[in-house]
Amino acid sequence: NPLLATSIINTGSSISARSQDGLGNYAFNYGIGNGLGATNSRAEFGDAAGNKKGSYTITDIDGRARRVDYVADAAGFRASIKTNEPGTALSAPAAAAIVSPYAPPVAPVAPAVAAPVVAAAPALAGAHLLAAPGISSYSSVIGHGAGLYAPGIAKTIFW
């Protein structure tokens, strides 16, 4: 198998670097490539004020590639993305072909709902008098246990 032989011989490579000063300014980067041609990398620079600028890239063995350049500062996070991934063209974002061994989802069947039946109100023979609400009052003592805790004290007090 030539593919297997290639992956055994070419295992890939990686590089990385980083630096930071006493003021909080920093920089780092790395790059990784495998023996089949896939790569990914990242680089970022930051300062003591919390501003960041960087990018990352990824390239797959089938040719798909993405690069993201970003800035994060007092104005927020902003990213610029460049890619050739399927379904991401501005002219036809939903045009990506989906290849799957599974059947597409089936829309649920909504049950038919009949209109509600409203019964006619009974006819009133005459006006009914209702008694005025009674006025009453009540009072009660309700006790709740509450734990009291202080250094050297641990008991329950009931009010």
UniProtKB/Swiss-Prot annotation:
Keyword annotations for this protein, in alphabetical order, are:
Cuticle
Q: Which InterPro entries match?
A: CHIT_BIND_RR_consensus (IPR031311), Cuticle_Struct_Prot (IPR050468), Insect_cuticle (IPR000618)
Q: Does the keyword Transport apply?
A: no
Domain called Chitin-binding type R&R: residue spans:
23-89
Cellular component terms per the entry's GO annotation: chitin-based extracellular matrix
Recorded GO molecular functions are: structural constituent of chitin-based larval cuticle
Q: Which Pfam families match?
A: Chitin_bind_4
What does the record give as the function of this protein? Answer: Component of the rigid cuticle of the spider.
Q: Which PANTHER family match?
A: CUTICLE PROTEIN, CUTICULAR PROTEIN 47EF, ISOFORM C-RELATED
Descriptive protein name: Adult-specific rigid cuticular protein 15.7
Where does this protein come from, organism-wise? Araneus diadematus
**Taxonomic path:** Eukaryota, Metazoa, Ecdysozoa, Arthropoda, Chelicerata
